Structures are given as structure tokens and as C-alpha cells.
A protein has these predicted regions:
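NAD(P)-binding Rossmann-fold cofactor-contacting core
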Residues: 149-175
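Short internal alpha-helix immediately C-terminal to a glycine-rich phosphate-binding loop
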Residues: 110-130, 137-149
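General structural feature for long, well-ordered alpha-helical segments within catalytic domains
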Residues: 14, 18-21, 111, 138, ...
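Short acidic low-complexity segments
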Residues: 175-187
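N-terminal ligand-binding/catalytic initiation module
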Residues: 1-107, 114-116, 126
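Acidic/polar active-site rim loop that often engages polyanionic ligands
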Residues: 2-4, 147-151
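Structural motif
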Residues: 132-133, 158, 182
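Conserved beta-strand segments of alpha/beta enzyme cores
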Residues: 2, 154, 178-180
């Protein structure tokens, strides 16, 4: 069994790898050769946390996996991300665990890739403005991934705590895109 710690994930997978994997699994799901099992998510009655399991199976690639994790709203004050998860991969023929993988970076990359795949296939080709609602941990991942899909001319964003938009503004500047913080009504 392989154990891949969180600290090693970013060096092992790129945004393009994530995009390709998500696009492939979306295609497999549309073809009904891959599917998700029902999600289990519950409040644990401690630390105001939500905890759950997401799992799925790809019959063609024989990928069987489970993500265990949740949301701990007090983690930011402890220097941790609020979302915490671990991924388990299993041998589809035997059920034996093949790998335990740190899931926080993978979750952010997968979520960003899903947004990017959606934009690549569904957004207007001439889209010029990217609107973002929310500035949580995954927002910068999503901005980078989605910005690669169109020739956006500017980014507009809203967050219920406007001071948290600075990380998105920094990424927009890194990408050479003007950034504007807007009210919910303006968005």
C-alpha cells in the first residue's frame, strides 16, 4: 500500500492533469461507465464540524475510491484549512486498499478542474468577464484553472467578507488581469 502525504501532492499533479482527469471522468459518467455512490454527510456534534464520505467507481479504468473528510469552521484560527480530507484508493478486484492520499490539495484541484471543464465546454467562447462568488480556500485554485479556459479581460468577485478578496486580487494580478471587488447587487 502506498501512502502519499499532503505535502507531496502539489509536486505530483498539475492543473492540466486535474483538468484531463476530471474531463475524462465526466465523460465516463455521461457514458454510465463511472458513477458516484450516495454521499454521506453529517454534523458530528463537536467543533461545529461536518463530516462525510464521497465515493465512486469507474468500471473501465477499475478505479475505486473513497474520500473521507469534512469541514471544520474553526480550523482557520488554528492555521489549518477548514476543509480536511483523506482519499483511499482500492483494488477493484480484491477490495484491498492500494493507497492513502492526502486529500486537501487534491480536493481543491479537483473542484477547480470541475469548474474549468464546465467553462471549457459550456461557457461562451467570447466570454470576457469572469465572476467569482466566494473567496474561500478553493477560490484561488478555481481562478487559476478557469482563467486558462477563456481570454478573460477582467475578474469581478464578491465575498461576504470583502477583506478576504485580497488573495483573489493577488492571483488576478499574477495573471495580468484587472480585478474588481463588487457588491452582490453589482455581480
Amino acid at each position: 500500500m502506498h501512502i502519499i502525504p499532503e505535502k507531496d501532492i502539489a509536486a505530483l499533479i498539475t492543473r492540466q492533469d486535474s483538468f484531463d482527469a476530471v474531463e475524462k471522468v465526466f465523460s465516463s459518467m455521461a457514458a454510465k461507465t463511472a458513477y458516484n455512490f450516495p454521499v454521506i454527510r453529517e454534523a458530528i456534534g463537536h467543533a461545529d464540524a461536518l463530516y462525510g464520505f464521497k465515493s465512486g467507481f469507474d468500471r473501465q479504468a477499475l478505479n475505486l475510491g473513497l474520500k473521507s473528510g469534512g469541514y471544520w469552521p474553526g480550523n482557520a484560527a488554528k492555521g489549518l484549512t477548514n476543509h480536511q480530507s483523506t482519499i483511499f484508493l482500492f483494488d477493484a478486484d480484491t477490495g484491498k486498499c492500494r493507497a492513502i492520499v492526502g486529500g486537501n490539495v487534491l480536493t481543491a484541484l479537483r473542484t477547480a478542474a470541475a469548474a474549468a471543464v464546465s467553462v471549457a465546454h459550456l461557457a461562451r467562447k467570447d466570454a470576457k468577464v469572469l465572476g467569482i462568488i466566494g473567496a474561500g480556500h478553493q477560490a484561488t485554485f478555481q481562478l487559476r484553472a478557469v482563467a486558462e479556459q477563456r481570454k478573460f479581460e477582467r475578474i469581478v468577485a464578491w465575498n461576504r467578507s470583502p477583506e478576504k478578496l485580497s488573495a483573489l486580487a493577488d492571483v488576478a494580478a499574477e495573471l495580468g488581469l484587472p480585478f474588481e471587488s463588487v457588491t452582490l447587487e453589482e455581480l
